[in-house]
């Protein structure tokens, strides 16, 4: 079984592409098995939350980070869990 890694994905997304287009920067920290899954997750989340198509999302940088570099408390809490079910 592969180990889950933490990735920081940075890029820009095009908001209000039809009226007044604005490129907005974003940074997402995600847990994934590899870079491809992390990119797919970012496309999925930004597309569903902001009603964006993939062509309106441009990923500029993706890097694997350690637990001490994570800024999102939810990611840290998930990474520190030993198991999900009580015994």
UniProtKB/Swiss-Prot annotation:
Matches recorded under InterPro entries: Ribosomal_eL20, Ribosomal_eL20_dom
Example of a GO biological process term: translation
UniProt cross-references to Gene3D superfamilies, sorted A to Z: 3.10.20.10
Gene Ontology molecular function: large ribosomal subunit rRNA binding; structural constituent of ribosome
Listed Pfam families: Ribosomal_L18A
Keyword Ribosomal protein: yes
Family: Belongs to the eukaryotic ribosomal protein eL20 family.
Protein name as it appears in the record: Large ribosomal subunit protein eL20
Organism: Staphylothermus marinus (strain ATCC 43588 / DSM 3639 / JCM 9404 / F1)
UniProt lineage: Archaea, Thermoproteota, Thermoprotei, Desulfurococcales, Desulfurococcaceae
